[in-house]
Amino acid sequence: MSQRVRRNGSPTPAGSLGGGAVATAGGPGSRLQPMRATVPFQLKQQQQQQHGSPTRSGGGGGGNNNGGCCGGASGPAGGGGGGGPRTASRSTSPTRGGGNAAARTSPTVATQTGASATSTRGTSPTRSAAPGARGSPPRPPPPPPLLGTVSSPSSSPTHLWTGEVSAAPPPARVRHRRRSPEQSRSSPEKRSPSAPVCKAGDKTRQPSSSPSSIIRRTSSLDTLAAPYLAGHWPRDSHGQAAPCMRDKATQTESAWAEEYSEKKKGSHKRSASWGSTDQLKEIAKLRQQLQRSKHSSRHHRDKERQSPFHGNHAAINQCQAPVPKSALIPVIPITKSTGSRFRNSVEGLNQEIEIIIKETGEKEEQLIPQDIPDGHRAPPPLVQRSSSTRSIDTQTPGGADRGSNNSSRSQSVSPTSFLTISNEGSEESPCSADDLLVDPRDKENGNNSPLPKYATSPKPNNSYMFKREPPEGCERVKVFEECSPKQLHEIPAFYCPDKNKVNFIPKSGSAFCLVSILKPLLPTPDLTLKGSGHSLTVTTGMTTTLLQPIAVASLSTNTEQDRVSRGTSTVMPSASLLPPPEPIEEAEG
């Protein structure tokens, strides 16, 4: 077999073994790690010059596998079955070797089924799991650092991910130069059973299914730099990032997982033009954001759990000993109304409750600072303390206490109580007078903190409580003020315009007076003549048209016909404009 001397001066023997040939290239002392990141860009043009002779095909039944290494040295690969296509590879990115009788233009660790050839770069051993293609390295191989170890053109092994070894898309510039781009670009979705990884799939398939996890495991920048600069890694991992996100979604919240997946996909799309350090920084930022979102979501959950319910249970437990059961009953509906509507008005509730507690006694003032430091749990126990004071008010009602109760009751919503206000206000005058005296004060106090006073103490025994249930506007006082004057003044005001209309009909010269009077027909031409100063056509036409239908309802048919005929005859000589007013009426009508 022929030998070709590469750029680093090491011969690459190509042998046909078992119908296939494995060509390994690389010198013993040719590992130059500093050149790793710059090789794909510096030696790109030198490849084409040094790839003067195509690779040679040995006698075999497999496909032709051309080794186009990024360093500009192409290792010859045998195994072309009698006339297999010989092509000099120009690719700058490693991809996996070809399948049966398929031309491959990029070298990788290839595992071929029938008889095939794999060409690797540098001194790393070729790994072929095919029974037909058995590679004999020129010297004992060093221990491979990774599963898909492929040595770089400067004979320094670049650690590729297994997902990239199995399926690594070439860059866009080289893709058009290749003979079979649809085969060379092997995505994990296009993976066929004849693909080389299927034989050696037991070792390579499991890690290749989740390249992103391997990317996270690799801590060195060298593993990220070479394939990332070649343009593989974002595209390859982006295709398989979704299932990884889904796996996490089963363990975390769906909304959080969706946001994370969107952020992750966006980062992969944008990072194609970035450096590896920027990539790592962005990954770190995403992790920090995820941790923050976890903590924030848990914190909100804890708040939601504690604010409506835990505070209630604590309040009930505190009040079981000193307060009777009658006071505990209203506590449960309190939190439903106040917690839903007035969850944000915690400060106002505290202010109003402090006023009530100052009126009742100093014992409860001592209990207030105990619950105040916990802002979310403070309002429910304070509301219950107000309910306990209400229970005292039910037993010993006083004038000031009634005033405070009236202020709280006037702010709850109940239309039925609104009706009872108007009825009972007339029945019980002293209570309504007290309410009228108290309400302006209550409005001033009630605007600061509505509802919870009323919600805490139902007091069904006292009848005056129902008076204190107007709508949310707290307009109960206005209702009493409006009801009494309307009955005195506004009701005659409603009748007055009606009486004016009735009295206005015989006096004024409108069409309605003709309808109502109709006894003397002499006023009809007078009215038309009077109206002619303003609008002849409309008045005459309206009088004739209104007389016909309305007289039918008021008078007999005989008198109607006579008077209507007379009316038309009298109107005609006085104002002979009946034919023009009719179209004018139509236009105006």
From Swiss-Prot:
Residues 137-146 have a biased composition (Pro residues). Keywords: Phosphoprotein. The keyword Methyltransferase does not apply. Residues 292-302 have a biased composition (Basic residues). Residues 16-29, 57-85 have a biased composition (Gly residues). Residues 45-56, 108-136, 147-158, 207-220, 404-417 have a biased composition (Low complexity). InterPro entries: Glcci1/FAM117. Residues 384-397 have a biased composition (Polar residues). Residues 1-310, 370-464, 556-589 are annotated as: Disordered. ALS2CR13 is mapped in the genomic region covering the complete candidate region for Amyotrophic lateral sclerosis 2 (ALS2). This is Protein FAM117B. The lineage of its organism: Eukaryota, Metazoa, Chordata, Craniata, Vertebrata. The gene is FAM117B.
